[in-house]
């Protein structure tokens, strides 16, 4: 029999207990990457310089990476073409296999060996529209691989409900309805709350890139610039009700380039991101972002760049490194290309698919399209070989590109 004996609980004991609890809480918070003034720091409070690659075309296919010049460009357009060519049942099976094969554990191992320390994962809202959605299964697997290799994961909402850009990249209807549709805004908030709830305790997930490249440079759409930061505030407030651990990443208007839409920072754990393509590779193109960092004492990050020659990539990377700006080049992997860390061969009969894809679309042109279809066996062979070519063991390393990033090239495959 146990006898409970009441003991006096002194004030000093209470204070000691509080000290232990707060120390534990602080230790838990420090396990996550977070901001510290103009720097990003890791869980041990050491400065963290991000050197990353974008896993583009995995969960949000883009037409140019299939060489569909003049053809389908958005995910839905590419999926419609696939369905038209191989039918709905085979198309559904194809895309499931695509998502299982395009990025694998071998790829994350290679990314680690090449010297990267982070990946940005562009996602489509449709894959995260329920707690048991396919996207969570795929991303959970990626997080597991990344945790093993010490690769930080940044989740990027590339395709938001309603569309934040109004072009192919957000899979919209050709207009950024997100900024004028209350339903789309509520849906986007719900997507981020679901993601935050799922990953709130996962330290290898570095942060959430809330909207990719909102509002293009088209003059007619710049009316929405004034709505961007208020919507970011709504997203942040909603996410912070669930997850106070992760960095919130905010991109400017006009393809993430215009920081004039921002006032003083409204979240104590936020980083600001910009994208730069086809510019001079010197410090003049990032000066306004450096000034923003100095003015508000917040970290900045290049979330996308690339699609250029090795010489340009090398020069721009040096500029970023010299100015202590973390970076993430686009993309990791492309078909028949030199402007990515790895590439894969063009599938058999793919030129026939590209030629067909360039025809004028729509059921009003069905007769002409049906007449121009490649032979059924060639179509099937092309899509089968595409799944074969994207496999990890069929990829080729672009050593010159990896070297241009200042990283150690992987062994040739």
Predicted segments — roles?
Residues 312-413:
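Aromatic-rich peripheral "rim/lid" segments of glycoside hydrolase catalytic domains that contact
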Residues 4, 9-10, 42-44, 292, ...:
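A general structural signal for short secondary-structure junctions and capping/turn motifs
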Residues 21-23, 166, 219, 314:
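Alpha-helical transmembrane segments and their juxtamembrane interfaces
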Residues 32-33, 89, 186-335, 339-355:
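Extracellular glycoside hydrolase catalytic/binding regions
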Residues 1-29:
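Bacterial Sec-dependent N-terminal signal peptides
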Residues 35-50, 54-247, 252-260:
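Active-site mouth of glycoside hydrolases
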Residues 11-14, 78-79, 91, 379-383, ...:
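Short amphipathic alpha-helical segments that mediate assembly, nucleic-acid/protein binding
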